[in-house]
Amino acid sequence: MKLSIFFVLFFIAIAYCQPEFLDDEEDEVEETLPVAEEGREKSCITWRNSCMHNDKGCCFPWSCVCWSQTVSRNSSRKEKKCQCRLW
């Protein structure tokens, strides 16, 4: 029991005496995460012709949605479009 109290007080003392140590780690994580996600978003947000090859799990946690649309108003030709969406 005394040993567990010692360890609790020891860790509290470390966290209290060196808060900048914990803050530095959090800042590093915050700095690297947006860069990684931004790169992923740029490579993933593209129009697709199908949802078959969802490289790198680009749509996760969303889903790949496909639909057909006409090429122009006067045309009867339809084109299949796919995109990652929340719904």
Curated annotation (Swiss-Prot):
Its main location: secreted. It comes from the Eukaryota. Residues 18-40 form a propeptide. Disulfide bonds join C44-C59, C51-C64, C58-C84, C66-C82. The keyword Heme does not apply. Expressed by the venom gland. It is found in: Secreted. Keywords: Calcium channel impairing toxin, Disulfide bond, Ion channel impairing toxin, Knottin, Neurotoxin, Secreted, Signal, Toxin, Voltage-gated calcium channel impairing toxin. GO terms for cellular component: extracellular region. Residues 1-17 form the signal peptide. GO terms for molecular function: calcium channel regulator activity; toxin activity. Coiled coil: none annotated. Belongs to the neurotoxin omega-lctx family. The presence of a 'disulfide through disulfide knot' structurally defines this protein as a knottin. According to the nomenclature proposed by King and colleagues (2008), 'Gsp(267)' comes from the species name 'Geolycosa sp (strain A267TDLS2-KZARNA)'. This species has been reclassified since that study, as indicated in the work of Oparin and colleagues (2016). Modulates Cav2.1/CACNA1A voltage-gated calcium channels (P/Q-type currents) in rat cerebellar Purkinje cells and hippocampal CA1-CA3 neurons. At saturating concentrations (>10 nM) decelerates activation kinetics and slightly increases peak amplitude without affecting deactivation kinetics. In vivo, does not cause death when intravenously injected into mice. In rat models, through its activity on Cav2.1/CACNA1A, has an ameliorative effect on memory defects provoked by hyperstimulation of N-methyl-D-aspartate receptors (NMDARs) in the hippocampus. This is Omega-lycotoxin-Am1a. It comes from Alopecosa marikovskyi (Wolf spider).
